[in-house]
Structures are given as C-alpha cells and as structure tokens.
Curated annotation (Swiss-Prot):
Family in the record: Belongs to the GHMP kinase family. Homoserine kinase subfamily.
Designated name of the protein: Homoserine kinase
Underlying gene: thrB
Subcellular location: Cytoplasm
EC number in record: 2.7.1.39
Positions of ATP binding: P82, L83, T84, R85, G86, L87, G88, S89, S90, A91, S92
Amino acid sequence: MIPLSVRVPASTANVGPGFDSVGIALSLYLDVVVKEKADKWQVIHSFEESIPTDDKNLIVSTACKVCPSISPHIIEVTSNIPLTRGLGSSASAIVAGIEVANQLGDLNLTADQKVQIATNFEGHPDNVAASILGGTVIGALDGKDISVVRIESKELGVISLIPNEELNTDESRSVLPKMFPFHEAVKASAISNVLVAALCQKRWEVVGEMMERDHFHEPYRLELVPLLPSIRKCAKEFGAYGTALSGAGPSIFILTPYEKRQEIAEQLARVFTDMKVCELEIDHKGIIVNKEEHIGL
C-alpha cells in the first residue's frame, strides 16, 4: 500500500517582464512517495549522483525545517522536470518538502501558509506559488509581506525548448545589474503592469507583445542564451503569441493559442534540432496529495 504520495508541477517564472513575480504551473511533475518509517531518512531516486539520498536532500531538509519532530521515512522520488533548466525544479522540491511535513506532522497548513513558507525558502513567490496553487500566479514579496493572486489561463498552450546545457540560477543572476536607473525601472514596470492586466483580461496578443519587451533581466541574459532572438522570431512566424526565457534560463518558454500548440511545436522541432521541444499544458491543479492511510509523525 502507498501511504502517501505528493505530486508537484513544474513552473516557469517571469514570463518576460514579470521578474520574480509572475509564475505559471506546467505539466511536468515531481512525484514523492513516502513509504515506511526508518532509522534515518533514505531517498530513493535515479537522478545524478550529486543529488543527496539522505537528510541533505532538499525535499527532506525542507520537511525537517518545517516540522523538526517528524520521524525519518523512506521516500521515493521521480521527476520529469529537467534540473537547472529554468523550469522550477528546486521550487518543486521545496514545495514537496513542505507538503511532506504538512502531512506527516498533521500541520493542516492552508495554501496561503504553504506559499508563505515556500517563499521564505525560495526568496521569491513566482515558482513556488505556481506549483502550490496551479494556474498563473502574480506575487509580490515586500519584506515579510507576501501577496499572491491566482488567475486562470485555460485558453493558452505552452511550448518549452530545452537545451542540453545546464545553466545554474546563481550564474544567470550574476549577469544582472546591481543598480537599475530610475527611468529604466519606470519603463520596465509599466510593461510588466500591462502584461499582468492583459493576462487578467485574456488579451493574449498583448500578453505576447509585453512578454517580449522585458527590460529587467532578458537583455543581460542574452549572452547566456544567444538563441532566444531567433527562437522568438520563428515562434512568432509560426503563430505563437510570445516567447521569453523560462525563469533564469536556459529553457525557452512560448505561449500559443491552445489549439495550435502541437502544430507550432512540430514546426519549431524541425528548425531547432539541437533542443528538446516539449508541448506542454498549464497545470491548473497545483500540488496533489493522495493519502491511503494516516501514518503521522
């Protein structure tokens, strides 16, 4: 019998100018199965050797920080979320750890509390809120105050172009400026405002236009992801709404009309043969827990 399983969707963040704020849950998943109690934590996985199999694993370490009193268990982890590709792999692990603690520790956390805790771990709400709530989220972190709004975007299709090369988030953040001129901040903020308004009003052409006009981060990250302009040009020609870096990169995130996503993905795959082209959907459920019996602390 499987006593407890947790499924967490991947996510993309920023959507162009919504830097560290806008996130979308995607149909790639991290699955965690909590098995029997053990003398110490054991994590069964088939990832690369650098991923810990003990209490240093991000899922376990997060769970133990959220609820230090939980007993060690054997857990099995599987995932089709690529690591260090800008698709929220670390955020999904953090969210999974919070939910494991929530279930084993009988914490009865609300969704808002999970977002608060996850944001404290991650440092920004976009990825974690999307993975917890599903759909499209717009979040703000101001000191200790976290505000998140969730909206539906069921008319959209998603394509992700995933390169073979990894790109560490710290490396991608290192190219960003430490200071931002006031006039540039005003311009960038205005574009981000219109992006969010267009998402809320389902004006998808405007969404696509705004997501390609970021000033906050993409101009500085182009040197790390030089194919972005050519992918953006082809995607638009094939009928996509817009293209942006997925999170910190190197994956590319494309929004399309839902009914055209397969056709556009096939066309892109013929052009960009060195990248994995994934036709995805927006995940609208967020974190899912299946519990067949109570196993407690």
